[in-house]
């Protein structure tokens, strides 16, 4: 497998073409951003840790029957994935009130919900990634009704799997963001990453944060936090 030209560079990753059709080469960066890019920093080691954690979690989800784009980890900061066309929606699952939800609906941060809430956000930096209803999504033709239903069902299934996994590590899965894409056959797959960049994780007992809120709120050293999370997950080096 050969890495070829750069296709896209985002806030946290670079995406390269390869010499194999429908396979992409992902490189995780040592960059942290928050508040839609208003806060930025270089965090040495962050790319390696997010690559390790995402590779582990996507492998475990694959074993649990969740179709996703991950193929294998190929270096400390790189992985191979199946090429997909990203559906321009962020699917957010919330188990505990935190972050923007607390501000938006006025409930105290830390309030445990009786059942998970699934939200859809438009992936559009110019608009500030607004929250959308299903009617908005239909109006903008971002996804079909069946695709939305599938993504919601998969998000809740992934939530069940990850909640159980993190609970075994004495962590609460507060909320998390997913992205999905369509492969060359039109099949919808879980894509992007699942890492402490995209999840809120709290220690069950102390409520210590094990996620990017440490950077957002200047609560400590991000590399140390992500390292502790990987250690709790077992520090496994996983491939599909």
From Swiss-Prot:
Pfam name, any one: SAICAR_synt
Statement: the UniProt record of this protein carries the keyword Nucleotide-binding: yes
Family annotation (InterPro entries): SAICAR_synt/ADE2_N, SAICAR_synt_PurC, SAICAR_synth, SAICAR_synthetase, SAICAR_synthetase_CS
Keyword field: ATP-binding, Ligase, Nucleotide-binding, Purine biosynthesis
Enzyme class: ligase
EC number(s) given by UniProt: 6.3.2.6
CDD domains named among the record's database cross-references: SAICAR_synt_PurC
Highest rank taxon of the organism: Bacteria
The family this protein is said to belong to: Belongs to the SAICAR synthetase family.
UniProt-recorded name of the protein: Phosphoribosylaminoimidazole-succinocarboxamide synthase
UniProt lineage: Bacteria, Bacillati, Bacillota, Bacilli, Bacillales
């Amino acid at each position: 497998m050969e890495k070829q030209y750069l296709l896209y560079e985002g806030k946290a990753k670079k995406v390269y073409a390869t010499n194999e059709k429908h396979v992409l080469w992902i490189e995780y960066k040592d960059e942290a951003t928050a508040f839609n890019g208003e806060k930025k920093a270089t965090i040495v080691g962050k790319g390696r840790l997010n690559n390790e954690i995402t590779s582990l979690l996507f492998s475990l989800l694959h074993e649990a029957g969740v179709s996703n784009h991950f193929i294998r980890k190929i270096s400390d900061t790189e992985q191979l994935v199946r090429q997909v066309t990203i559906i321009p929606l962020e699917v957010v699952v919330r188990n505990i009130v935190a972050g923007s939800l607390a501000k938006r609906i006025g409930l105290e941060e830390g309030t445990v919900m009786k059942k998970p809430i699934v939200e859809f956000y438009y992936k559009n930096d110019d608009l500030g990634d607004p929250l959308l209803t299903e009617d908005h999504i239909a109006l903008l033709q971002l996804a079909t009704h069946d695709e939305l239903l599938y993504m919601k069902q998969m998000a809740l299934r992934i939530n069940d799997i990850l909640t159980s996994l993190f609970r075994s590590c004495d962590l609460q899965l507060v909320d998390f963001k997913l992205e999905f894409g369509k492969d060359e056959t039109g099949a919808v797959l879980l894509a992007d990453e699942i890492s402490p960049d995209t999840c809120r994780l709290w220690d069950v007992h102390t409520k210590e944060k094990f996620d990017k809120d440490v950077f957002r709120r200047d609560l400590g050293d991000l590399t140390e936090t992500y390292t502790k999370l990987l250690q709790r997950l077992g520090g496994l080096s996983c491939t599909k």
